């Protein structure tokens, strides 16, 4: 039976006429006032700052006092909305499974790619990888204000203090090694400019691309050659997808529309924008109480029912954006395409490609979804790296360490390797600082962080090479699906996830990195980059070059498949490939793990125990909830699948961690 809904925060906010920051801070375990000392101070309550704090509190409960400082008065808008099974697995380790998460977020069932032919308008190829059966795993499309609010409340329930409306004063802050030597200056709020000083052993830079502390140690590094710019907006989410001009299109995928200059992301997700923060806090708290009580999925209120219960705004939207190379040559005058740069470049590419025009005719622009001036967004020169990610008394996590591109969503999903590993290391850092003289402590901490520094130093170039590999392959409709996507999933599919626990999660994440550090993957990636980059972007790749790269990739693939020590049902996971990862033109069969609600149009996981739409509450029939396995499972496969998702050996965290440093050809 579900708990009784409570309106604690709504009533508290009304009684005290509390601001957003005040009502959020009132939920801290030690209250709203900043502490005099804290083992760890985290700068930034974005997704990685909160993942760090939650992971540290769960890894060794009650061992560290953690204070998270966030300048915004409430969780606010950020781009980065698509997650992978690794993110869901981490959420599940923290007590929140799919039944509860899907009341707040959208379902994601794998990734689909459409490769547009620039020279033959209207023609395309595709690649599709499904997700996983709902009884085992899930993936989510998340609106960031909601994910950050969920993690804020969950962190507070785990003993972490999260202070909104407070800002680290980096000019006055003193960070030094050797134990408890940090003096973190924090503003008290809008109407009190006198900073409060917090004594701490460790400062964590979780300020994302702004790199507020990292930037003091070294300027950001830009990679040679072309970079990428992104421009995007928010659109309606059509219930009827039948008019979309791509075969077998489904809104439950993260859809990628790829072309020689870049690609478009298409992400269908729910938005709670416009809701009062106190009301949202009441709803999230209720969801967490339901999770604690183990309320079955079909006994939970749907998202629409929750919105009515707690007086919230709720709608489905579509995030659509371009991530395009910055060496593209645009017309000198773009005024015919709109009034702002983001709008102009967005519409320029829509009109350049016939299929993009047809596609966008199914969507209507939502103006100012996240407040005035938020109809169009643009971000330039996306890729960078922080040369220094730790030092005496501090370390960096997430995008503060570097970022490459939204393609394959590494920012959240791969970035979790830094935030969770740093969380585990922090316990040892603080222990060393308390148990040894300052100089000896700092020497030990420096040695402890060498592997972390080396990992971050190799991680971002590996992701940059991965990004460039995919981009250059998008220049041909054969290389996109048969080389880039094939290798991304063969090397990077998330194996062993069912065996990961809170102690081994970081080690798993460090080794995964979307397959970008797998030697065979790097071999194919470097070959493609070396060859394709010799051809100007506005020219078509020669057929002889494409044939050579296909043959090279297939040789490496065949050897890797033969040597692979585990079996996956590749013909069921990938739409156009057989079990040995051979491309099969015209093959459309695959497993089916989702269905679309006939009422609201939301995409739902197929599970025998879930007949209710998590979005609108409409009940389905038993046949509608059945998974289709194509090809059918053997008895052994069925037993293994429901036990562990795949037939791989158990994940062994004691395996030697090898971190090869990838090399990238000169631009």
UniProtKB/Swiss-Prot annotation:
Stretch list, region Flexible region: 621-646
Similarity section: Belongs to the flavin-dependent halogenase family.
Recorded domain comment: The very flexible region (621-646) acts as a substrate channel lid, having two main open/closed conformations.
Keywords: FAD, Flavoprotein, Monooxygenase, Oxidoreductase, Zinc
Mutation effect (residue 494 to A/Q): Abolishes malA catalytic activity
Result of changing residue 613 to S: Leads to an insoluble protein
Entry's EC annotation: 1.14.-.-
Organism: Malbranchea aurantiaca
Record PANTHER family: FAD-BINDING DOMAIN-CONTAINING PROTEIN, FAD-BINDING PROTEIN
Catalysed transformations (reactions): (+)-premalbrancheamide + 2 FAD + 2 chloride + 4 H(+) = (+)-malbrancheamide + 2 FADH2; (+)-premalbrancheamide + FAD + chloride + 2 H(+) = (+)-malbrancheamide B + FADH2; (+)-premalbrancheamide + FAD + chloride + 2 H(+) = (+)-isomalbrancheamide B + FADH2; (+)-malbrancheamide B + FAD + chloride + 2 H(+) = (+)-malbrancheamide + FADH2
Cofactor: Zn(2+)
Residues at the catalytic site: 108
Protein purpose: Flavin-dependent halogenase; part of the gene cluster that mediates the biosynthesis of malbrancheamide, a dichlorinated fungal indole alkaloid that belongs to a family of natural products containing a characteristic bicyclo[2.2.2]diazaoctane core. The first step of malbrancheamide biosynthesis involves coupling of L-proline and L-tryptophan by malG, a bimodular NRPS, to produce L-Pro-L-Trp aldehyde through reductive offloading.
Source organism phylogeny: Eukaryota, Fungi, Dikarya, Ascomycota, Pezizomycotina
GO molecular function, one term: monooxygenase activity
Industrial and biotechnological uses noted in the record: Malbrancheamides have the ability to inhibit calmodulin, calmodulin-dependent phosphodiesterase (PDE1), and induce both endothelium-independent and endothelium-dependent relaxant effects, suggesting their potential as vasorelaxant agents.
Gene this chain is encoded by: malA
Result of altering residue 253 to F: Displays selectivity for producing the C-8-chlorinated isomalbrancheamide B but does not affect the selectivity for bromination
Family matches, as InterPro entries: FAD/NAD-bd_sf, Flavin-dep_Halogenase_NPB, Flavin_halogenase
Annotated positions binding FAD: 48, 70, 79, 82, 144, 168, 399, 412
Ligand binding (substrate): 494
Keyword Electron transport among UniProt keywords: no
Protein name from the UniProt record: Flavin-dependent halogenase malA
Pathway the protein takes part in: Alkaloid biosynthesis
Entry annotated with the keyword Flavoprotein: yes
Manner of cofactor binding, per the entry note: Binds 1 FAD per subunit.
């Amino acid at each position: 039976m579900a708990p009784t809904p409570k309106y604690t925060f709504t009533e508290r906010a009304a009684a005290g006429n509390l601001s957003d920051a005040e009502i959020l801070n009132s939920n801290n375990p030690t209250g709203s006032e900043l502490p005099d000392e804290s083992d760890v101070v985290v700068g930034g309550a974005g997704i990685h700052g909160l993942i760090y704090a939650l992971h540290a509190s769960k890894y060794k409960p009650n061992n560290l006092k953690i204070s998270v400082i966030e300048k915004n008065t409430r969780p606010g808008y950020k781009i980065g909305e698509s997650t992978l099974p690794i993110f869901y697995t981490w959420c599940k380790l923290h007590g929140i499974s799919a039944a509860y998460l899907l009341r707040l977020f959208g379902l994601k069932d794998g990734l689909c790619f459409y490769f547009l032919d620039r020279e033959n308008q209207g023609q395309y190829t595709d690649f599709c990888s499904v997700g996983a059966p709902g009884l085992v795993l899930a993936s989510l499309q998340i609106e960031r204000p909601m994910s950050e609010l969920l993690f804020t409340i969950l962190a507070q329930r785990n003993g972490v203090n999260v202070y909104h409306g407070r800002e680290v004063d980096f000019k006055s802050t003193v960070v030094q090694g050797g134990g408890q030597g940090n003096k973190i200056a924090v503003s008290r709020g809008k109407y009190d400019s006198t900073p409060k000083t917090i004594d701490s052993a460790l400062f964590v830079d979780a300020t994302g691309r702004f790199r507020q502390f990292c930037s003091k140690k070294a300027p950001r590094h830009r990679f040679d050659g072309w970079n990428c710019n992104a421009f995007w907006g928010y659109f309606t989410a059509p219930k009827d997808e039948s008019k979309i001009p791509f075969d077998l299109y489904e809104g439950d995928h993260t859809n990628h529309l790829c072309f020689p200059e870049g690609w478009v992301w298409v992400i269908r997700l729910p938005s709670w924008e416009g809701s009062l923060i106190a009301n949202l806090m009441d709803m999230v708290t209720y969801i967490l109480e339901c999770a604690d009580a183990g309320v079955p999925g079909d006994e939970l209120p749907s998202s629409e029912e929750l919105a009515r219960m707690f007086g919230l705004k709720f709608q489905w939207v579509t995030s659509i954006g371009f991530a395009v190379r910055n060496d593209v040559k645009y017309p000198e005058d773009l005024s015919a395409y709109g009034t702002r740069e983001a709008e102009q470049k967005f519409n320029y590419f829509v009109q350049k490609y016939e299929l993009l025009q047809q596609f966008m005719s199914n969507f209507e622009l939502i103006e100012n979804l996240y407040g005035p001036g938020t109809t169009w967004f643009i971000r330039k020169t996306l890729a960078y790296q922080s040369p220094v990610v730790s030092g005496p008394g501090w370390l960096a996590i997430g995008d503060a360490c570097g970022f490459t591109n939204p393609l394959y969503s590494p920012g959240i999903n791969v970035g979790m390797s830094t935030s969770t590993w740093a969380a585990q290391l922090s316990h040892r850092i603080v222990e060393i600082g308390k148990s040894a003289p300052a100089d000896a402590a700092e020497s030990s901490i420096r040695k402890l962080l060498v592997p972390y520094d080396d990992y971050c130093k190799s991680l971002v170039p590996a992701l940059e090479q991965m990004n460039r590999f995919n981009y250059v392959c998008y220049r041909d409709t054969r290389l996109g699906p048969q080389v880039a996507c094939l290798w991304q999933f063969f090397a990077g599919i998330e194996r062993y996830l069912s065996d990961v626990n809170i102690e081994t999660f970081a080690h798993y994440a460090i080794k995964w990195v979307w397959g970008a550090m797998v030697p065979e993957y790097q071999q194919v990636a470097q070959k493609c980059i070396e060859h394709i980059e010799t051809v100007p972007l506005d020219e078509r790749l020669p057929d002889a070059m494409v044939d050579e790269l296909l043959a090279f990739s297939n040789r490496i693939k065949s050897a890797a498949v033969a040597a692979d020590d585990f079996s996956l049902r590749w013909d069921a996971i990938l739409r156009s490939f057989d079990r040995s990862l051979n491309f099969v033109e015209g093959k459309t069969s695959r497993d089916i793990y989702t269905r679309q609600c006939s009422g609201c149009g939301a995409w739902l996981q197929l599970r025998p125990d879930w007949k209710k739409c998590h979005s609108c509450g409409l009940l389905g029939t038993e046949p509608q909830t059945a998974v289709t396995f194509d090809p059918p499972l053997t008895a052994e496969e069925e037993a293994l699948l429901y036990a562990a998702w795949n037939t791989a050996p158990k994940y062994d965290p004691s395996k030697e961690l090898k971190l090869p440093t990838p090399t990238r050809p000169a631009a």
